[in-house]
Structure formats: structure tokens, C-alpha cells
A protein has these predicted regions:
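Hydrophobic transmembrane architecture of multi-pass small-molecule transporters
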Residues: 182-276, 281-296
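Short, hydrophobic transmembrane alpha-helix segments
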Residues: 1-5
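12-transmembrane solute porter fold
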Residues: 7-17, 21-206, 259-260
């Protein structure tokens, strides 16, 4: 999609083929006695809703993890080590807060925990829409740590609550289904956000190109300054185009983070419909009992 465009025949054909195979896969799974993915888990509303929220969160999360290294290494000139070190504190925060978030899940339930975590994540993602070529390294690290702090209250509690909403006989099937959907959503999110970045970069590059009118006195002054530093007009134009390319790419990344923020807002809205732990468990037991009667 990044090279051909979403409206190209090749991409539309692949989408159509993918949808057809998904439909065939669902039909086959529903007819099998021992399916690869047991779709019976979708009969339980809390599991279904938490799975959808997980997928929407993954749309935002995975794409963001791809965009930041592109910004840091390709545009700002940081090494792969520096890029990894920037992301490291966020990962540590998630690991350290995981057990604490699990205890809070048992105490206050999933709904307030998820709303808090996704709200923090949404704010931090929005802050990443303001990147420029001079954004301090430590500022970016702080924003990413804040984003990871919010994620710590979402990831494990959301998975735990989803599995707890199922009867014991379906727990393993629910775990397999949830992990599959999370990975799928992460891949889709990466594709969407990278495509937004490349598409918007092209548009911004075109807009900046129109502003670089050589008859503009301001542009002429800058060209003369650059020409004196880089050995003539050709060197000056090369440096100027490199800078404009970087500037357009930064704006494209910011636009992609806007889309990631929208995904986070959607997840936040969906959290408002979550049930309490007790109600979700009671609903699961009732549905399981009804299904057992129907099977008999």
C-alpha cells in the first residue's frame, strides 16, 4: 500500500482475497469439532469487548513503536543503541508495574483501571504529535515513559479480565484467540500508521516545495548563505532539499501519531461499556449454563 496506494488494483485484489479466506476460515472453524480457534469464546460479551479494546490498543501501540525509531535514527541521526536506550525505561516501567496493576485489578476491577491507563496513553500519544527536529532526547523519553506507564495498567489486566470472563473449559481457547487477534491488530496498525506517514510525507513535501519559490527574497537570502557554505548553488540546493525532506517526514510522523491518538480515544470510549468483575463472571456462568443445556 505504501508504494502502490490503497486504491490500486493490486491492493484491492489482495484485500478481497484476504476477506474471502477469512470468511472461509470462520466457516470451517465453526464446523470443526476441534477448531484451531474456538469461536465459541465470542459468545461471552466481556471477553468479546475486551478483545476488541485490546485490538484497538494494539493498533496504536505497535505503530508507535515503529515510528519512533524511524524518527530518532533516520531523521535525528541517533544510533540504534541510543534509540533502544530511549525505549528501555518505558519497557522497565511496564515490567515493574505489571504485578501492581494485577493487584489493582482484583481490588477495583477492570473498568476504572482501563479507563485510567488508556487516558494516560492517549495523552502521551497526543504529545508525540508535536515532534520536531529540535525536540530534546529526554523529552521524548519522558513522553514514552508516560505512555508505557499507562500501558502497564492495560496490557496484563485486560488479558486477565478477558480470560476470567470465560468458563474454565474455554480459558485456553480464549487465550489463543486473544493472542492471535492482538498480533493481527498490531500488524494492521503498523501497516496503517506507516502508510499514513508515507502518504502525508509526500503531501507535506509537495506543500513545502511550493513554498520554496526561488523568486522569494527570503529563499534567495538563505540560498546565498548556503551557497557560500557548501560551495555553490548545487551544494546549497542539495542541503536545502535534505532539510525539507526531513521536515516533511517529521510532519508525516506527527500525522501518523494523530491517527494513533484517534485509535486510543476509540479504545477509551469502548472502556465505558465494560462490566464489573462480578457481573462479567455471573454473565459468563449463565451463558455457559445455557449453552450446556442447549448442547444436551
Amino acid at each position: 500500500a505504501g508504494n502502490k496506494g490503497w486504491g490500486s488494483v493490486e491492493i484491492e485484489t489482495m484485500f478481497a482475497i484476504g476477506i474471502i479466506f477469512i470468511i472461509l476460515f470462520v466457516i470451517r472453524e465453526l464446523r470443526m469439532k476441534s477448531p484451531m480457534l474456538n469461536l465459541e469464546v465470542l459468545k461471552f460479551p466481556t471477553f468479546t469487548l475486551t478483545t476488541i479494546i485490546n485490538m484497538v490498543v494494539m493498533l496504536s501501540l505497535y505503530g508507535g513503536m515503529i515510528l519512533l525509531p524511524i524518527y530518532l535514527q533516520n531523521l535525528r541521526g541517533f544510533s540504534a543503541l541510543d534509540s533502544g536506550l530511549l525505549l528501555l525505561p518505558g519497557s522497565l516501567i511496564m515490567g515493574l508495574l505489571g504485578p501492581f496493576a494485577g493487584k489493582l485489578l482484583d481490588t477495583i476491577g477492570l473498568k476504572p483501571l482501563a479507563i485510567f491507563g488508556i487516558a494516560v496513553m492517549t495523552y502521551a500519544t497526543w504529545e508525540l504529535t508535536k515532534l520536531n527536529m529540535d525536540t530534546p532526547y529526554m523529552t521524548i523519553m519522558g513522553i514514552y515513559v508516560l505512555r508505557s506507564f499507562g500501558m502497564a495498567f492495560i496490557m496484563m489486566p485486560m488479558v486477565t479480565a478477558a480470560i476470567n470472563a470465560l468458563p474454565g473449559r474455554l480459558a485456553s481457547h480464549g487465550n489463543a484467540f486473544l493472542n492471535t487477534m492482538r498480533q493481527l491488530a498490531g500488524s494492521i496498525g503498523t501497516a496503517i500508521l506507516v502508510t499514513v506517514m508515507t502518504t502525508q510525507t509526500t503531501q507535506h513535501l509537495s506543500a513545502f516545495g511550493e513554498e520554496l519559490d526561488k523568486t522569494n527574497p527570503v529563499v534567495q537570502d538563505h540560498m546565498h548563505e548556503l551557497a557560500s557554505q557548501y560551495g555553490g548553488q548545487e551544494g546549497a540546493m542539495k542541503v536545502l532539499l535534505q532539510f525539507v525532506n526531513k521536515l516533511a517526514t517529521v510532519e508525516g510522523i506527527n500525522d501518523a501519531f494523530i491517527v494513533a491518538t484517534i485509535f486510543s480515544i476509540i479504545a477509551l470510549i469502548l472502556c465505558l461499556f465494560l462490566q464489573s468483575n462480578k457481573k462479567a463472571k455471573a454473565t459468563a456462568q449463565k451463558l455457559d449454563a445455557d449453552n450446556s443445556i442447549n448442547h444436551e
